[in-house]
Structure formats: C-alpha cells, structure tokens
C-alpha cells in the first residue's frame, strides 16, 4: 500500500512500506511521521515555494537537494546547519543516480527552471516528483524562448519514455491557461504513469477539471487534488 498527503502547492508526503519521502515542503502542516521508518527529504530547488530551512530540523536519514541550494560555509553558518546535518545532505544536479538507503535509488532529471526532478525507486515502486520541470509556455513570451523551452523539456524528459511510474506529481499550473496542459499531457503520453497527482496549482484546484475536459482519456490515471491536507491511499493494484 502507498499513501500520500498533499501538504500544499508542490509539497507531498509519500509513505511506502519501508521508507517515507517528503517532497518540496515549504507550506502546510506536516502529518505525524511513522516512528522507526527512515525519512528522505527532497528539495528540488531553492525557490521559496519549494524549499524552506525548517526541513533541516527534521530527523531525516538524508536530505536530497537540487544543486542550486548552495551548502556553502556562509550558508551553513547563516542557516545554523550543524556538521552532523550537513553530512546527511546530498547536492544533486541533473542526470545523477544515488542510493541514499539500501534498496532505494534516486535518479534526477534537469529542470527547465531551477534545480532537478526526482525519480525514486523503492519497495518495488517508482515515484516521480517533477519539481519545476515543466513545459513552461507563456502567452506573450518571445516565440524563440517558448520554442527553446519545448526543446529542452522534451530532451530532459526523454529518459522517462515508456518507463513505468507508479505515482507522478506533476505541475498543472493555471497561470499558463490552457498552455498549462502541455506539460502533464506530454508526461502522461511519454511515460507509463499509473497515477498522476497535480501540483503547483496555486489553490486553483478546479483547473484539473478543465484539464480533464480537454484530455478525458487521462481521467482514469488522474487523481484530483481538492484541498490542502488531503490524504490518498493507493492499493497495490492501483499503483
């Protein structure tokens, strides 16, 4: 059984049988953590809607951080980061693979914005958190910029082609209007995503309905998020 809690914006807590995964928590109440189960904390990049210093107060086995979150001596002093905590931090760029725990593999993809996306394999499941890796197509932006964004997005996500992903947390950003459908639609066509949790919606949870009205074929795999603090449980046959 896999459990997930939507903390807010792009923050999720995912519970697998043998490990707990915390992604991009910066807002919302963190549920009680399971005692005796190792915690891995992920921060995809430094933007304030994806990262906050309070994560370092958690009793985590490891902190996996996008490389743009600089653990320089100056930052460590400013953040009052102990040597013990700093030793558990892994700074990751795109296209890296690490094993922070026995039986757990973390792969990264470059982002089209800042930092990285995370692909975690553990307990026979694969969980993907995109961070800000998205097809950012902005109406009114320079056409060349938008074309370059499309090229980079498709190149960065190519390693996911045909790959089974049991649970994917993907940006579905209403600020882009219908252009916000581009990213998740491409992800869902590219990879074998079993369950998709929308994120980065800025509280506009009804935007998922608009996405599904445009792409009804994705309804069976899309799990709408409707409120902060919402819990989800996925049985083995569902993910």
What are these regions (language model features)?
Residues 1-36, 87-164, 229-239:
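Core dinuclear metal-dependent hydrolase active-site scaffold
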Residues 5-10, 84-98, 181-239:
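Binuclear metal-ion centers of metallo-dependent hydrolases, dominated by the metallo-beta-lactamase
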Residues 22, 42, 64, 127-130, ...:
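Structural motif
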Residues 27-74, 158-169:
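Active-site metal-binding motif and surrounding structural segment of the metallo-beta-lactamase
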Residues 28-30, 46-51, 70-74, 96-99, ...:
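Active-site environment of divalent metal-dependent phosphoester hydrolases
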Residues 52-60, 75-78, 206-215:
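Metal-dependent catalytic neighborhoods of phosphoester/phosphodiester hydrolases
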Residues 64-96:
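Glycine/small-residue-rich loop that forms an oxyanion/phosphate-binding "nest" at active or ligand-binding sites
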Residues 152-158, 177-186:
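A short, acidic, amphipathic alpha-helical segment used as a generic capping/interface helix at domain edges
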